[in-house]
């Protein structure tokens, strides 16, 4: 079933609605019209006890602060980084918002920090839609992005994206939800056990911008081809990882066909027994462990805090900055 409530209001006075889908087993997902974002996701532990496995806030206005990490929000038109805040496409140069140093992060955030329309609802699904006019934030085409969330009886949360444009354009949407399967944001995710089906990663420079090269992660601190705790090597020195930040890297998924629908990663929390399997038809997944979040002070849900290394994002995507690195 699906239930609609009022989540709250933005400083502009705009109302943010919340839609909660619950299956017959009691699992549920709550989704907001701001950024078509995931606010809560209740899933059972090994004993059947339900808990909220995602980070977030009680006040919708907090979701619009980019320093708080795009919690649970849809990112578009182009997720991740664009070098130099510009790209060439079909013989023309397009300039995007320079919102992070000398480059663009998450297209400037407009898709994430604005209200979406509810296009359709069903017993166990909802479709959100947002229209982006031609050249908004520098991207070509009158562009509509839709995302459909479906919660199944098997406790699978499915996200399906659809893009429509009246001219050739670029698109790379993702969702920026952070998981903490312990349901206790006071605990870091360093004890979570992660597997990523990848043997290569996108090499980056000192600004974490892709160089266009693919590196071999076999035997390095980034090698999650066999499961091991996130915290086991997160602070080990490595050229692609910023000291003190930890993992914030694109893994190139090992698939016979880069667009095949296959399992990308598995996240397991030993104490609760909760296990998350992430599937995608995209070639990459950004593993980000919240290292850029403040170490204290960020409010969360209830008395919790959204702080340093309290959640892990597994962002399925085309490779970062592939607008400049087509190969």
Feature locations, PLM:
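An exposed, glycine/acidic-rich loop-and-rim segment of catalytic or binding clefts
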Residues: 1-327
């Amino acid at each position: 079933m699906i239930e609609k409530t009022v989540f709250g209001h933005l400083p502009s006075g705009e109302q943010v609605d919340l839609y909660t889908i619950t299956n017959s087993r009691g699992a549920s997902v709550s989704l907001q019209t701001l950024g078509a974002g995931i606010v809560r996701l209740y899933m059972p532990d090994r004993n059947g006890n339900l808990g909220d496995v995602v980070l977030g806030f009680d006040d919708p206005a907090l979701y619009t602060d980019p320093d708080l990490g795009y919690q649970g929000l849809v990112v578009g038109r182009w997720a991740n980084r664009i070098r130099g805040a510009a790209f060439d496409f079909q013989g023309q140069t397009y300039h995007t918002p320079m919102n992070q140093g000398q480059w663009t992060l998450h297209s400037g955030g407009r898709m994430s920090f604005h209200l979406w329309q509810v296009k359709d609802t069903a017993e166990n699904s909802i479709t959100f839609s947002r229209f982006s006019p031609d050249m908004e934030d520098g991207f070509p085409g009158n562009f509509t992005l839709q995302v459909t969330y479906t919660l199944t009886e098997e406790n699978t949360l499915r996200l399906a994206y659809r893009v429509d444009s009246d001219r050739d354009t670029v698109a790379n949407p993702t969702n920026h939800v952070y998981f903490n399967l312990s349901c206790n944001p006071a605990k870091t995710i360093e004890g979570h056990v992660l597997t990523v089906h990848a043997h290569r990663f996108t090499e980056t420079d000192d600004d974490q911008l892709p160089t266009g090269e693919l590196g071999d992660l076999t035997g390095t601190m980034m090698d999650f081809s066999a499961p091991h705790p996130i915290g086991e090597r997160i602070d080990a020195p490595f050229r692609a990882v910023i000291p003190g930040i930890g993992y914030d890297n694109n893994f190139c998924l090992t698939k016979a066909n880069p667009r095949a629908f296959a399992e990308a990663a598995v996240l397991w929390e030993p104490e609760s027994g909760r296990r998350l399997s992430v599937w995608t038809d995209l070639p990459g997944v950004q593993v980000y462990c919240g290292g850029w979040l403040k170490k204290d002070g960020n409010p969360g849900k209830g008395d919790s805090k959204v702080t340093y290394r309290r959640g892990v994002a597994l962002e399925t995507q085309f490779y970062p900055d592939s607008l400049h690195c087509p190969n």
